[in-house]
């Protein structure tokens, strides 16, 4: 039975059914990609942009690829065969409301399509109000958000690990069945073998405690255990977001210049990094006034007028199925929460630095 399952998976690979979904970062995609039964952990300090990175790499870029692959007109333009992959995303936004998430995503999409920046604060009328033309732009994206709702389910507010596990089981049973395959083993059969289901938790530090898991560590351990089960039994792809602990900024590490993220820097529990197949970390070296380990000129990635920082370092700390300890420089536009891979240090030009700060870099495809 075990070899038959392995053979079926190998055949799926030969048929191109295990290629997965691109994350929108070409260099990163050489090492990792979105496919079934993978557990991702993404960490960073507050303000590092980890939620924006999750949204870019695991939600918006995959979604845009998915609708492009499955839209006949787009397939004709790109001369591609519509993908058989079906994408489903369950997004547990425990820190931000559903309305805020959608506003951020629309703001990003308007900028990509139109080159117009409408910050979330303006979109929602917190301070300034949109002009008539800006409002007309916003209304153009109703169908885009409607298409999102067919693929992405946003659930806001904290929950405990058992509650989330029950919801994942209910979702699995709505989209498949569980059978007893022999005396000892059960197996889950999805209705659609080509469906990739991402389960995003932002962030695990907000998992609620219970009587059975009264401490934060126990709650996170339980959640990671349930995510591992969802990966192994249902074939789901969990993506957990985690805060770093404070040791990354202690005086001794700052003095030694040793502030680059390590596995030990993930807060509260070691279970998440042990259970995850892939561990990624975002780091803002400007925050600690240290040089970038890859050698980018950080002074040229800082807007001297506004103080906006346009750089983050992404490190692939753990990769169970390939190369790790990989660093990639990312240009970061915080106004709309957008990331884009920078040229390698040896290839970056003066015009690249300038384009990043004046934001035209983010519009180049």
Where in this protein do the model-derived segments appear?
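Structural recognition of the conserved hydrophobic beta-strand(s) that form the central parallel beta-sheet
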Residues: 91, 200-201, 236-243
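C-terminal regions of RecA-like/P-loop NTPase motor modules
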Residues: 2-6, 46, 75, 84, ...
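Flexible beta-alpha connector loops of hexameric P-loop NTPases
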Residues: 127, 153, 209-220, 251-260
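Signature of the SF2 helicase/ATPase Hel1-core->accessory helical subdomain module
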Residues: 206, 243-250
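Structural motif
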Residues: 41, 197-202, 239, 280
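The Walker A/P-loop phosphate-binding site
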Residues: 1-112, 363-364
């Amino acid at each position: 039975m075990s070899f038959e399952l392995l053979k079926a998976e190998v055949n799926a690979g030969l048929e191109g059914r295990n290629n997965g979904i691109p994350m929108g970062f070409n260099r990163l995609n050489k090492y990792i990609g979105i496919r079934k039964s993978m557990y991702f952990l993404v960490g960073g300090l507050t303000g590092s942009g980890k939620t924006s990175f999750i949204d870019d790499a695991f939600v918006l870029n995959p979604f845009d690829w998915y609708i492009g692959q499955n839209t006949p007109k787009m397939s004709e333009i790109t001369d591609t065969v519509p993908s058989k992959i079906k994408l489903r995303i369950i997004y547990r936004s425990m820190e931000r409301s559903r309305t805020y998430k959608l506003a951020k995503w629309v703001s990003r999409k308007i900028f990509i399509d139109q080159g117009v920046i409408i910050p979330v604060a303006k979109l929602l009328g917190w301070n300034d109000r949109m002009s008539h033309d800006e409002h007309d732009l916003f209304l153009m994206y109703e169908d885009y958000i409607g298409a999102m709702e067919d693929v992405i389910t946003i659930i806001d507010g904290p929950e405990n690990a058992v509650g989330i596990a029950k919801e994942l089981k209910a979702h699995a049973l709505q989209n498949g069945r569980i059978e007893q395959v022999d005396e000892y083993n059960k197996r889950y059969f999805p209705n659609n073998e080509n469906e990739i289901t991402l389960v995003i938790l932002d962030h695990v530090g907000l998992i609620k405690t219970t009587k059975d898991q009264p401490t934060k560590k126990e709650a996170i351990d339980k959640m990671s255990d349930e995510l591992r089960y969802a990966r192994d039994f249902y074939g789901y792809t969990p993506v957990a977001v985690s805060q770093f602990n404070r040791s990354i900024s202690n005086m001794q590490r700052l003095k030694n210049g040793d502030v680059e993220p390590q596995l030990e820097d993930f807060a509260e529990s070691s279970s998440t990094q042990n259970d995850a197949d892939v561990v990624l970390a975002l780091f803002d070296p400007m925050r600690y006034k240290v040089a970038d380990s890859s050698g980018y000129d950080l002074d040229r990635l800082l807007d001297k007028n506004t103080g906006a920082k346009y750089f983050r370092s992404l490190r692939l700390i753990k990769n169970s199925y390939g190369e790790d300890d990989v660093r990639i420089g990312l240009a970061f536009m915080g106004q709309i929460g957008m990331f884009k891979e920078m040229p390698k240090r040896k290839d970056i030009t003066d015009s690249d630095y300038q384009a990043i700060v004046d934001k035209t870099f983010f519009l180049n495809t």
